Amino acid sequence: MAGSTRILVWDGALRLFHWSAVLLVAAMWWTAENGVMDWHRRMGMILVGLLAFRIVWGLIGPQTARFGSWRIGPAAVLGYIRNLRSGVHKPSFGHNPMGTLSVIAILAALFMQVGTGLFAVDVDGLESGPLATLVSFEAGRQAAEIHEISFNILLALIGLHVAAIVAYLFFFKDNLVRPMVTGRRASEDFGNVSLSDAKLSWLRLAIAVAAAFAAMWGVSNAG
């Protein structure tokens, strides 16, 4: 769009979280499949920090990162679906209602992966999560089974997420990947929105990063 102003929708910290999580999930799958469990555990600890960061960032970050900006009420979701079925799509400043549900589901699956992985024990008791010593062998085995099931659920959710992105591009000519890379969209998509809405606060960023390191330190020292 020639001459348009491009507004910052996704701050750099949120984008870094997003793509780091993508890479970590792929790498952790590979390490688990190939038995590289030392690295699997290390990357799991990084994911602990990332999720702690996301929780704090969802409370104190810019508008589009905050949980309070998410529209997930039945009226918002059903109204959005009706518009899509009618062929009406207006880009949202942040997550649209369906995108919000997708993010919540994926984050929940990631938390389930991390939570069970920390306590999981393999069938021979040779490999285990960093907190496995805090629970019985039977509980560790149950955690391992849930860990595997929840990963399959996570893969299904990621598949649906990617399929939705492709559908938006195909049916509505709306590229949702580019803004998650550059952070910006044309301001004309949103109307009158303050350009400062998605900018970083370095103090708040420092607090969120500190929370991430605190979570990693706490987990690594709890076992």
What are these regions (language model features)?
Residues 1-223:
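Membrane-embedded alpha-helical bundles that constitute the cytochrome b-like, heme-associated redox core
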